């Protein structure tokens, strides 16, 4: 089955979501699909090298193999998408681009949640957030990590008169 994103834009997340739901429905952890793009459809992404960079940047996809037809107008990627990775990246993207709050109950000791936090930080550092909000988002994220990582039973950190931190 070929999944075609003719516009070659970031609406491809809908395509990825379909793939992720198929994985969940079939009880698999990994799904391999053909991902087909018409190279010449959008002048912004003319050329296989640009399309390759675009597909490689899509959250949740890992390129296994690629090929271009003999006319150079269609580019086919064989991609793997991983269920846990996809959903972790999706949550991280929601936090960075849509300013969605991190779940208050997020437990940083849970390995899956820790992956979401790492990926969120990765997205902030790589410029996925809006430029005007990048620094503020980064500060908010670090503060959120700090708040989540603190044990509520411990007293807050204070500074003595001579500048020494104590708990």
Q: Where do the model's predicted regions map?
A:
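Short amphipathic alpha-helical interface segments
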Residues: 13-29
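Amphipathic helix/helix-loop-helix segment enriched in hydrophobic residues with interspersed Lys/Arg
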Residues: 1-7
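C-terminal leucine-rich, beta-strand-based interaction scaffolds used for sensing/assembly
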Residues: 28-114, 130, 134-165
């Amino acid at each position: 089955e070929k999944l075609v994103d003719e516009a070659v834009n970031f609406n491809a997340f809908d395509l990825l979501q379909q793939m992720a739901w198929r994985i969940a429905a079939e009880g698999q952890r990994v799904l391999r699909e053909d991902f087909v793009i018409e190279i010449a459809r959008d002048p912004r992404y003319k050329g296989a090298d640009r399309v390759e960079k675009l597909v490689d940047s899509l959250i949740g996809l890992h390129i296994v193999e690629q090929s271009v037809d003999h006319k150079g107008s269609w580019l086919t990627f064989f991609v793997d998408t991983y269920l846990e990775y996809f959903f972790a990246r999706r949550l991280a993207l929601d936090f960075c681009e849509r300013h969605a709050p991190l779940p208050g109950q997020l437990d940083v000791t849970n390995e899956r949640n820790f992956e979401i936090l790492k990926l969120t930080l990765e997205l902030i550092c790589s410029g996925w957030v809006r430029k005007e909000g990048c620094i503020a988002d980064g500060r908010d994220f670090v503060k959120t990590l700090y708040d989540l990582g603190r044990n509520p039973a411990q007293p807050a950190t204070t500074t003595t008169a001579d500048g020494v931190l104590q708990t």
